[in-house]
Curated annotation (Swiss-Prot):
Pfam family, any one: Ribosomal_L2
SUPFAM superfamilies: Nucleic acid-binding proteins (SSF50249), Translation proteins SH3-like domain (SSF50104)
Signal peptide as annotated in the record: none
Function: One of the primary rRNA binding proteins. Required for association of the 30S and 50S subunits to form the 70S ribosome, for tRNA binding and peptide bond formation. It has been suggested to have peptidyltransferase activity; this is somewhat controversial. Makes several contacts with the 16S rRNA in the 70S ribosome.
Family according to the record: Belongs to the universal ribosomal protein uL2 family.
Protein name: Large ribosomal subunit protein uL2
Gene field: rplB
Listed HAMAP family: Ribosomal_uL2_B
Keyword terms of this UniProt record: Ribonucleoprotein, Ribosomal protein, RNA-binding, rRNA-binding
NCBIfam families for the chain: rplB_bact
Segments for region (Disordered): 33-53, 221-278
Residue ranges, compositional bias (Basic residues): 269-278
Xref: InterPro entries: NA-bd_OB-fold (IPR012340), Rib_uL2_dom2 (IPR014722), Ribosomal_uL2 (IPR002171), Ribosomal_uL2_bac/org-type (IPR005880), Ribosomal_uL2_C (IPR022669), Ribosomal_uL2_CS (IPR022671), Ribosomal_uL2_dom3 (IPR014726), Ribosomal_uL2_RNA-bd_dom (IPR022666)
Keyword Ribonucleoprotein on entry: yes
Length: 278
């Protein structure tokens, strides 16, 4: 999908650049594959704000997307490509030979009428899913499992992908978008291709209201607040905060490392932070 630029017929149209969705399905989703979705407004079950900057937004239905791809050796035909408000990628409605319908993440270069299949070993073509151990080295993949049977967790966002760069003792080595290289079990599943909608990050929404439609509220900078409200607040005139960036509760942010899962540290060959200055 290409980007679509709009003429400045009004202030809200000036600079507006959106992804062209003219090739997507214009009707409603399959009702059996959707469910209602209640908005939280960033509040927990006690009504306390636990995630700031979230409120409102257009009403959405949740689409059940098959991240597991465990219906093996059953060809499926792509019926249509659809917009999904719950994610940045597009989704594809596929119909299996036995008549079952399912939504899958749409990879780039997947079109209506194409056939996809999942299995232990399949052809290397966009939309086909197979075990990582059966893929050729160098394959571009997405929707990659970290635990066999759990469903894809890596590379599900618009335009993302993982590259399989090697094999080692029943494990495979993959390179992630962040630059991290890590081991994954060979019996995990992955889908061939990169995720659709790579231009998602190049959009210019052009007005605050469009972000509100997406359910995003404005976030006030800490340096614009008073000392009572934020560690960066206060000062005479405009200041830079005077310390390393922290959250309103004084925890380091913007680059501070938060990973504490020592059990899987041995699976990471090269950290995504390896390029940073010591």
């Amino acid at each position: 999908m290409a980007l679509k630029s709009y003429n400045p017929t009004s202030p809200a149209r000036r600079g507006l650049v959106l992804v062209d969705k003219s090739a997507l399905w214009k009707g409603k989703p399959v009702k059996a594959l959707t469910e209602g979705k209640r908005k939280t407004g960033g509040r927990n079950n006690k009504g306390h704000v636990t995630s700031r900057g979230i409120a409102g937004g257009h009403k959405q239905k949740y689409r059940y997307v098959d991240f597991k791809r465990r219906k093996w050796d059953m060809p499926a035909t792509v019926e249509r490509l659809e917009y999904d408000p719950n994610r940045t990628a597009f989704i594809a409605l596929v119909k299996y030979e036995d008549g079952e319908l399912a939504y899958i993440l749409a990879p780039q270069r997947l079109g209506v009428g194409d056939q996809v299949i999942a299995g232990e070993k399949t052809d290397v073509k966009p939309g086909n899913a197979m075990l990582l151990s059966q893929m050729p080295v160098g394959t571009i993949i997405h929707n990659v499992e970290m635990k066999p049977g759990k469903g894809g967790q890596i590379a599900r966002s618009a335009g993302t992908y993982v590259q399989l760069v090697g094999r080692d003792r029943g494990m495979v080595i993959v390179r992630l978008n962040s630059g991290e290289q890590r081991y994954l079990r060979g019996d995990c599943m992955g889908t061939v291709g990169a995720v659709s909608n790579p231009d998602n990050g190049n959009q210019n929404l052009a007005k605050a209201g469009r972000n509100r439609w997406l359910g995003k509220r404005p976030l006030t900078r800490g340096v614009a607040k008073n000392p009572v409200d934020h560690p960066h607040g206060g000062g005479e005139g405009r200041t830079s905060g005077g310390r390393h960036p922290v959250t309103p509760w004084g925890k380091p942010t913007k680059g501070a490392r938060t990973r504490h899962n020592k059990a899987t540290d041995k699976m990471i060959i090269r950290s995504r932070h390896a390029k940073k200055k010591r």
